[in-house]
């Protein structure tokens, strides 16, 4: 596990973004952990998150010309990742995001930021049903850009209704790579090194055995 991945998990635990217990997901499944990226909600959190996303992007090796943040949660992620790439890696990465509703005055249109073109990496917090990806794909197609990859903070590595995960569906349907700061396996590796979290580790392992891909 890379240092930034460990730091991400520790920040998520500290901010209670990542919690252990028994949680009922939208799918109806009972999960032993819950992840709510909305609790990364201060300036320092955002600065750190940007660094983690930037590190994951560089680790992926994907050729990226622009970061796209789907409204609404993807907007601060794209922004802070672009800042981190400039500050820590001397990469001046263009970014843009969409509005939910087109603006009919001022600069107009549905996009804000750099022109949407080239190899685009979409950044978001998690993928559940993949709806935001599908909507964003339409926007990217309209501008004749290419979706090169999707970057999220956590890959739960669990099946959807069928035999594959929502992430695998996105990779299959759009021919792009989805990568993340951490995966469920990374979380399990982290928990394995924390003796006081053994009960949580056992519960997460059991959940992976039942629903994992």
From Swiss-Prot:
Protein's pathway: Pyrimidine metabolism; UMP biosynthesis via de novo pathway; UMP from orotate: step 1/2
Q: Which Gene3D superfamilies match?
A: 3.40.50.2020
One MF annotation (Gene Ontology) recorded for this entry: magnesium ion binding
Q: Record's GO cellular component, any one?
A: cytoplasm
Q: Which reaction does it catalyse?
A: orotidine 5'-phosphate + diphosphate = orotate + 5-phospho-alpha-D-ribose 1-diphosphate
- Which positions are tagged coiled coil? none
User: Where on this chain does orotate bind?
Assistant: 34-35, 128, 156
The entry marks the following residues as binding 5-phospho-alpha-D-ribose 1-diphosphate, namely 26, 72-73, 99-100, 103, 105, 124-132
What enzyme category does the UniProt record give? transferase
> Keywords for this entry?
Glycosyltransferase, Magnesium, Pyrimidine biosynthesis, Transferase
* Tree of life domain: Bacteria
EC number, as in UniProt: 2.4.2.10
| Cofactor(s) this protein requires | Mg(2+)
Record GO biological process: 'de novo' pyrimidine nucleobase biosynthetic process; 'de novo' UMP biosynthetic process; pyrimidine ribonucleoside biosynthetic process
The UniProt entry's sequence similarity note says: Belongs to the purine/pyrimidine phosphoribosyltransferase family. PyrE subfamily.
By its UniProt entry, which NCBIfam families does this protein fall under? Answer: pyrE
Role description: Catalyzes the transfer of a ribosyl phosphate group from 5-phosphoribose 1-diphosphate to orotate, leading to the formation of orotidine monophosphate (OMP).
Name of the protein: Orotate phosphoribosyltransferase
Q: Which organism is it from?
A: Photorhabdus laumondii subsp. laumondii (strain DSM 15139 / CIP 105565 / TT01) (Photorhabdus luminescens subsp. laumondii)
């Amino acid at each position: 596990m890379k240092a930034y991945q460990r730091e991400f998990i520790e920040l998520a635990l500290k901010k209670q973004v990542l919690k252990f217990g028994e949680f009922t997901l939208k799918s109806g499944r009972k999960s032993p952990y819950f992840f709510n990226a909305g609790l990364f909600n201060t300036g320092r959190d955002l600065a750190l998150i940007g660094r983690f996303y930037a590190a994951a992007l560089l680790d992926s090796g994907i050729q990226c010309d622009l970061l796209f943040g789907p409204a609404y949660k993807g907007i601060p992620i794209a922004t802070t990742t672009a800042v981190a790439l400039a500050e820590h890696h001397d990469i001046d990465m263009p970014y843009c995001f969409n509005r939910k509703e087109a603006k009919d005055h001022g600069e107009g249109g549905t996009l804000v930021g750099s022109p949407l073109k080239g190899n685009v990496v979409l950044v978001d917090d998690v993928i559940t049903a993949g709806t935001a990806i599908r909507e964003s794909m339409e926007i990217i197609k309209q501008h004749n850009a290419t979706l090169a990859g999707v970057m999220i903070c956590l890959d739960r590595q669990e099946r959807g209704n069928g035999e594959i995960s929502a992430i695998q569906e996105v990779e299959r349907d759009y021919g792009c790579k989805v990568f993340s700061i951490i995966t469920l396996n990374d979380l399990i590796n982290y928990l394995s090194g924390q003796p006081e979290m053994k009960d949580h580790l056992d519960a997460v392992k059991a959940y992976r055995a039942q629903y994992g891909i």
